Amino acid sequence: MSPGVKVALVPGVLALLPAYAGRIDPVAELRAACVEAVRWLGNDFAVVADPQGMRVVEALRRSLGLDGRSAVTGLSARPTAVLVVGNGSARRSEKAPGHLDERAVAYDSELEKALRGGDVEALRGLDRGLAAELMVGHVDGFARLAELLIPGAAAEVDYADDPFGVQYWVMRWSLPA
């Protein structure tokens, strides 16, 4: 029996870069969840990320003693491990980077429901225009995630919170081969 496919989701938040940690890490719990998700994937995994997300992936890999740039990008062959980088709205509160947009919490709630339950149709059908207005991080990553997931695949949720008014998730899926 061949091994299954591991898929993980982490946010592409710059606060995860070492330069932002400082003496007191503002995202210690999030960082720990992200590091564990990358460790769970193993040494070699494909990455679905925008340029900012790639910086975060490189930093997470280095924190584990791995070559920051050795992660494979793209999904040309069927990989056995994939890291997707993306996050929810950056407009969930008055102090959020994009300030408050009343639609943000509902949007993120529907996105989280789709992620938790492996609703690939909902992930494919995300409103990209609304996502842009709500400052969703790397919405294309969620569409790529839909290509990887098996419909109904439940996620293991390691982190789901909105510090600084931005929705972040760390989730993992173990899929059959």
Annotate each PLM feature.
Residues 1-58, 64-68:
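A short aromatic-anchored loop/beta-hairpin motif
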Residues 25-32, 55, 106, 136-140, ...:
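Conserved active-site and cofactor/substrate-binding residues in soluble primary-metabolism enzymes
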Residues 52-61, 92-100:
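Short Gly/Thr/Asp-enriched flexible loops that form oxyanion-binding sites at enzyme active sites
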